[in-house]
Amino acid sequence: MDMQSKAKKLIEMIQTAPVEWKPLGEVLVRTKGTKITAGQMKEMHKDNAPLKIFAGGKTFALVDFDDVPDKDIHREPSIIVKSRGIIEFEYYDKPFSHKNEMWSYHSVNKHIYIKYVYYFLKTQENYFRNIGSKMQMPQIATPDTDNYKIPIPSLETQQKIVKILDKFTELEATLEATLEAEL
């Protein structure tokens, strides 16, 4: 079966799959960040340290586990909500923390595949940016994501969607790297 046939079959499967719509805060666990300033992050940063601390946009610091209180270290695959400035979602599946004005979600529900939710939220970033743009400094609050309803198809459907989107993401990265190398 060629890629176009697979894509048509996937679209058909999604359109006919039973879907429940539930608020994000009802189906995922929201976690808090750590109290840290940009200056402290810069001071603590060590190249190749094992723990990533996320801040707004593309800003992060690599630190040692001892640098952050254990209660603020998240070890589950998660969606990090970058809630100020550039509003976006990031998926991360290694131990991490983030600044306390941000939050993250992970799943303890065996019927929810966190990476599926991440891919869905990526398609909704403009919605959240529009909410955030009403402020002088763009930002959203936890109720904005907690109360946001997401479609929840069967776990099997979620896994198929993620498998296909992971392939597309990988192909896109390969294509970008190839184009950059040629230029």
Locate predicted features.
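Amphipathic alpha-helical segments
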Residues: 1-4, 16-20, 146-183
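Extended macromolecule-engaging scaffold surfaces
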Residues: 2-9, 28, 32-40, 52, ...
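Short secondary-structure junctions
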Residues: 127-130
